[in-house]
């Protein structure tokens, strides 16, 4: 079968890889000059299934109001008056209750845990190297309230079967030695030992080369103008004067998927702007060992081979990719506070990207009402975490094979009135980990 994939970020490339392994004739189209040039280029580097959770959670609306007046707030909103933004924000607010949160989180954890297993299998099969580490993630708490809340909320992890350990401030240095010097600023941490880290861009570039060797064709520097429809299916992709035809099509355009699908399939995917700093390491002993997540500022600090990646924050500002100096100040403040001697901040590379977010936090993976059109988008801040699982899942669906995990509630059909997912036991009715 001929398959055209639109988008060469980590989600598009993993989709291409798994489809090619099934024997399909795969073509990937992207407007950039190579893979992983946009959202996948500078993310925080976390592969954190245990922390897979929607931004839409109980208490977030009130927190968002408070954050409006804080200099280093993790979330910022700038209204542009567009119907897309207002509608998406309203849908997100409707998901900010405990019942929706538990359903959405259970979906996200299911896919994220599966994705980590797929990545592990891919790594074993190919030997792909991407500065990956299997050292876990350590969530850091700065207040007693944060620590106490975590102690109450670990039932979420128990329910999902995710290993964890709750550490006191004195125990943090046993897993992150450089934190010994700043333990007095912290009240403890929650460690997930099975989480991983790695350079998403490097992974995507190298997997793209492997996919090309497996027969995948990449067409770069080519903008997609329109999807052509005949009856109940896609007839081709219009790229300038050319029409590229296939038997099946996959939209993996990230935050730009919504506009491409306008008038064909309605999806609630909106850009959530994030930032990162990439800092050269000057003293390995003073740098993080794996990944730490600052709960107060929602900032992740990740270790690559000879670099530190500091990433996070969320701005609801439309498709604006300009670099905001105030956001750099926040990233610098957090890394200086926790790892003051780990790297040379004066040589840091500042970056921003647009994460494709759904209002319920769950990505959209699967078929659409157009019988040969498939979606793999809306992964938000967890594209790297969920990429391999989403790619394998989509390949199974296109192949007509029953997926390894329940997937009906991951498709766009879940937004349809009257949708009834398969019966899956929900997570415990407790407060979310935030």
Curated annotation (Swiss-Prot):
Q: Report any one BP term from Gene Ontology.
A: D-alanine catabolic process
**Molecular-function annotations in GO:** D-amino-acid dehydrogenase activity
Q: What's the cofactor?
A: FAD
HAMAP family reported in the protein's UniProt record: DadA
Entry keyword set: FAD, Flavoprotein, Oxidoreductase
Q: Where is FAD annotated to bind?
A: 3-17
**Entry protein name:** D-amino acid dehydrogenase
Q: Which GO terms describe its cellular component?
A: cytoplasm; plasma membrane
List the catalysed reactions: a D-alpha-amino acid + A + H2O = a 2-oxocarboxylate + AH2 + NH4(+)
State which Enzyme Commission number(s) the record gives.
1.4.99.-
